[in-house]
Regions:
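Carbohydrate-associated surface elements
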Residues: 105
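N-terminal glycine/serine-rich phosphate-binding loop of ATP-dependent small-molecule kinases
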Residues: 1-99, 113, 145, 228, ...
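Conserved phosphate-binding/catalytic loop of the ribokinase/pfkB sugar-kinase fold
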Residues: 102
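Active-site beta-strand/loop segments that form the cofactor-binding cradle
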Residues: 81, 89, 176, 209, ...
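Active-site core segments that coordinate phosphate-bearing ligands/cofactors
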Residues: 5-6, 72, 110-126, 130-166, ...
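Anionic group-transfer/hydrolysis microenvironments
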Residues: 10, 93, 212, 271, ...
Length: 522
């Protein structure tokens, strides 16, 4: 039996999954971590990356031995995935030059706007190229020493293999991709170099960006140093082949088998984003719509919101804390299930309650920062059912505003495949999202495995693919042929209730603007 390892560094958890050649999960391990807000920047410390990789692999290896009775000694392929975008730069000796600036930051507005106008292509603030221009334009002390700019997935892949490469889907969140060549767009690279010329830097853009590879290509092998980094016990041997590292968007597409034109998926966890694979790339400049690619290079339209479940999780933790103080500490899974299910019996419009869940800025609604808030009027129907429903609607609201833009552009999709934390409690998030987006929402049993499973599948494809076998055929015929899919269609009451909720939500955004202006973050 061939065993494939997938590792994903998510916003709140680093997860490792081992699968067989048919995609069946064999063992898993994980490590919880959180981003830090330091000196005005959302970041993670790279020492925590090392710790998280080791702990998640250690837990996976123990889980494998417990389940199968033998130690995990041979792995046939490995893949690494992580949160896309951000800014992670190193010098020639691979010393870190600046704090890791994650996707969550909204500090590059001027650079993103300038690049959008220069390229005629929407460049979001979280993209690596926007962060690079921001650092150069600001005259930051490290810019002349940059030898390598990469993402978190690219960084970890380099540490394990010594190869400075990324998958094309991951690359599309660094710099725009030309889907006819599956490489960085040459015209935009040239324009970027021209913009930076006045700063007399010792490098050109392509000098510092990772090489772009497509799904199925070999991306290097586990080095001795990489094996020790992942497994300090020495049980893991060097020489294991790697697939190209991909971002959470690409692994989400793979995990839901949504990589063919006119298919789509929605990932709902710490952030929320919907991706629809297109027949051909959008040509119109849509500043609030991101244009990325699948792991095979097909054009994708993405609607992205920085915050989804963070505020929900904070409230659930508050309820848990209250119950614990009363001497009745709850089972977290049961607490989530109870609270989420209560939302299904609330008033369709949440009884006049409204929540703004912004923990960070949001491009779609033009916020540079966020302040989570909850508002009600004296005559609101303030019940736990309506409260939870308002929190769940808020988690979907910004996505809905972006999806409306795609509807205006006549981008169509028959259904969206959902995955992520919002769907862990069966039915609830799926049903409310179907009504909110007025689109059927489907969930696969396997989608709960998430991005670590998705990148493990890409590792399996890279190693076992037959001659001329496409990723689409591999997934259709070998992984998802017998997949169980649950689909929920929009409910008219949910749809009408969400529309009423959105009217209050849009009005409450003015309160949010005042909160951002008046309440400062320490």
């Amino acid at each position: 039996m061939k065993i494939f390892l997938g590792i994903e560094l998510g916003s709140t958890r680093i997860k490792a999954v081992a699968i067989d050649q048919n995609g069946k999960p064999l063992a898993s391990g994980g490590f919880d971590w959180e981003n830090r807000y330091e000196n005005g920047v959302w970041t993670y410390h790279l020492k925590d990356v090392r710790t998280g990789l080791q702990e998640s692999y250690k837990e996976l290896a123990a889980d494998y031995k417990e389940k199968h009775g033998t130690p995990l000694t041979e792995i046939s392929g490995i893949g690494v995935s992580a949160m896309m975008h951000g800014y992670l730069v190193h010098d020639k000796l691979y010393n870190q030059l600046a704090e890791f600036r994650t996707w969550r930051n909204t500090i590059t507005e001027k650079s993103a706007d300038l690049l959008t106008k220069t390229f005629g292509f929407a460049i979001p603030q979280r993209w690596s190229i926007a962060h690079l221009h921001h650092a150069v334009a600001g005259g930051e002390s490290h810019i002349n020493d940059i030898h390598n700019l990469s993402t978190l997935a690219g960084y970890v892949h380099y540490r394990l293999t010594g190869e400075n490469v990324v998958g094309v889907g991951e690359a599309s969140g660094i710099m725009p991709i030309d889907s006819t060549t599956n490489d960085y767009d040459a015209e935009m690279v040239s324009k970027m170099d021209s913009l930076l010329e006045e700063h007399k830097l010792p490098w050109k853009v392509l000098d510092i960006l990772p090489k772009v590879l497509c799904a199925g290509e070999n991306a290097g092998y586990l080095t001795e140093e990489g094996a020790k980094l992942l497994d300090p016990t020495g049980g893991l041997k060097a020489g294991v082949p790697f697939c190209p590292p991909e971002g959470d968007a690409g692994t989400g597409m793979v995990a839901t088998n949504a990589i063919k034109p006119n298919t789509g998926n929605v990932s709902a966890g710490t952030s929320i984003f919907a991706m629809i694979v297109l027949e051909k790339a959008l040509t119109k400049l849509l500043p609030k719509i991101n244009k990325i690619t699948t792991p095979t290079g097909r054009p994708v339209a993405m609607v992205h919101s920085n915050t989804c479940t963070s505020d929900l999780d904070a409230w659930v933790n508050l309820f848990s804390e209250a119950m614990t103080k009363m001497g009745n500490p709850p089972d977290k899974t049961e607490l989530y299930r109870t609270l989420y299910n209560s939302a299904l019996t609330g008033d369709p419009d949440c009884g006049g309650l409204v929540s703004i869940n912004y923990h960070a800025g949001e491009t779609v609604t033009e916020f540079l920062e966020g302040r989570p808030l909850f508002v009600r009027t004296p005559d609101s129907n303030f019940t736990i059912e309506n409260f939870m429903r308002s929190l769940l609607f808020s988690a979907i609201a910004t996505l809905k505003l972006g999806m409306d833009i795609l509807t205006e552009e006549e981008v169509k999709v028959s259904k969206l495949l959902g995955h992520g934390g919002l769907f862990k409690t069966p039915v609830v998030g799926q049903k409310l999202m179907a009504g909110a987006l007025n689109t059927p929402i489907a969930v696969m049993e396997s989608a709960g495995e998430g991005g670590a499973w998705g990148i493990a599948l890409l590792a399996a494809y890279a190693v076992t693919k037959e001659t001329d076998e496409t990723l689409e055929n591999f997934l259709d015929n070998k992984i998802f042929a017998d997949a169980t899919v649950s689909t929920i269609k929009p409910d008219a009451k949910d749809k009408k209730g969400f529309e009423a909720y959105m009217e209050r939500y849009k009005a409450a955004l003015e309160i949010e603007r005042t909160a951002v202006d008046k309440l400062t973050i320490k």
